[in-house]
Amino acid sequence: VTTPATNPNKALWEKGDFTQVAASMRESGEALVRAIGVSPGLKVLDLGCGDGTTALPSAQLGADVLGVDIARNLVEAGNRRAAAAGLKNLRFQEGDASDLSPLENGSFDLVVSIFGAMFAPKPFDVAREMVRVTRRGGRIVMGNWIPGDPTLVAQILKISAAYTPPPPEGFISPVTWGVEANVKERFGAAGVAEGDIRCERDTYTFHFAGTPPQFVDTFRRFYGPTMNAFDAAEKNGKADALRQELEALFTAQNQSTEAGRTKIPATFLRVTVSVR
């Protein structure tokens, strides 16, 4: 897989330590892998895999899994998790979702990207590469946050954007992957018929062993986009306003009935592509 040294996303996802946020995503990751239908012997590519929230449970179900991520620290963390779990059928490597060479054409039964490839630049290249490495008769499954959605992550990104400088000209927002028409256009350009693309809304729940303000602090300290928002907000004296806005959001959306715990469901677009 080509070196991602020039990818502007690399610094963003190597900033902080996304594993600290990913810890709140494990339970839903396992449930999603089961719902997708991962089975023994399946060759799976997990794209934008982080430290293995869906890659590790896929391997535990008996699939042969390769995790690819732009961030070296997350790849290293994933390989440590695989070793600790004794999983010989799971490995992680650095790579760019928009250029998966030298992965061979049609080499995977299933390509999974849950809140991963949506953050890569060049979305048409990303779609083309996912289709290219999937065998005929195989599937691609994406999970993408939805722009303007009232639930957690879309609102974190929306609030954060209000505190950060405007993106460079030509920037394509990651949440454009959460719009069905865009999904169909991008995979259509990669040669997929519209009837082979299915989009449905699904729910991903975050489970955090702490209060909503403590969960906000985890995002502030470890999640690249939120860290950047606070860096920018601190420069113009608005960091406290950003913190208060995020704490209000997390507190309002917390559904946990246990004191000192946080449980927040977030809506996403689940995309299933059949490759023929």
Regions found by a protein language model. Name each.
Residues 98-110:
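A short acidic, Gly/Pro-enriched loop at the edge of an enzyme's catalytic core
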Residues 190-192, 264-276:
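Core SAM-dependent methyltransferase catalytic element
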Residues 1-42, 53, 77, 85, ...:
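Conserved class I S-adenosyl-L-methionine
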Residues 43-100, 125:
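Class I SAM-dependent methyltransferase SAM/SAH-binding core
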Residues 109-124, 146:
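A short SAM/SAH-binding and catalytic strip from SAM-dependent methyltransferases
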Residues 4-14, 197-258:
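C-terminal helical/coil "lid" or tail adjacent to the Rossmann-like core of SAM-dependent
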Residues 124, 131, 135, 139-210, ...:
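Conserved catalytic/acceptor-binding region of the Class I
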Residues 33, 56-59, 79, 124-131, ...:
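A structural alpha-helix within SAM-dependent methyltransferase catalytic domains
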